[in-house]
Amino acid sequence: MNIQDMILTLQKHWSNEGCVLMQSYDVEKGAGTMSPYTFLRSIGPEPWRVAYVEPSRRPADGRYGENPNRLYQHHQFQVIIKPSPDNIQELYLDSLRALGIDPLEHDIRFVEDNWENPSLGCAGLGWEVWLDGMEITQFTYFQQVGGIECKPVSVEITYGIERLASYIQDKENVFDLEWTSGFTVKDLFMMAEYEHSVYTFETSDVDMLFHLFSTYEKEAIRQMDNGLVHPAYDYVLKCSHTFNLLDAKGAISVTERTGYIGRVRNLARKVAKTYYEEREKLGFPMLKEEGSSHE
């Protein structure tokens, strides 16, 4: 099964479970969790079901396209369900069956791996899912997002698309993976992998990036003061990505690193608080929609 068919299969499976199929969010981010479809929608009491593919940029993992398992940008298939259903593990195993992986014929283990994202003030209880000894999915029950306690708890399922495809296609080099008929990962992404690695490690302007971080930080605060959650959060994401570029370049010392992470976290917490307050002013409208849909 090629990657395109994998994505279509997962989309169909989770759509059948009531998930909204969203498109990837158009601001750079290091993980699918950072999308507003997860970060913001996990806050507050309103129900939410979503599934989407998220390109995830990790500048420090760039290897000029020369490493068979490390990528500047990889892809995640992200599922969020709030509140978490009691049968979520079985729904997940059903998704593996849809991909042609029979749990009865493979060693599938849920290995405890509690998760946190310090820069966003997020934490949860969770597991890595191992398929015949290889991690393919992260399974997390959110306890806190943006410093706000999650009530009710959301469950997040994050499939590593290239990792899972490597298993399904039995390929050792990620660039040899078939994306769709006639196109490999190498065909689609090798040039970008090389160029982003050159930029990250060689040609990026450190002074400019420091300036951008401060500019984005100020604009995030200014838009929160205006009560504009989504524009503010876009600038939080830009701060995070800019920090990752500086960190990958080695421009931030160990002692400075903690301070920069704290600055991003403070912004994320303010956005989370503002989002909750704005939804509360609206009377948490999706609660009413959920109630009416069951009448």
From Swiss-Prot:
It catalyses: tRNA(Gly) + glycine + ATP = glycyl-tRNA(Gly) + AMP + diphosphate. Its main location: cytoplasm. Its EC number is 6.1.1.14. PROSITE patterns: AA_TRNA_LIGASE_II_GLYAB. It holds the Pfam family tRNA-synt_2e. HAMAP family: Gly_tRNA_synth_alpha. This is Glycine--tRNA ligase alpha subunit.
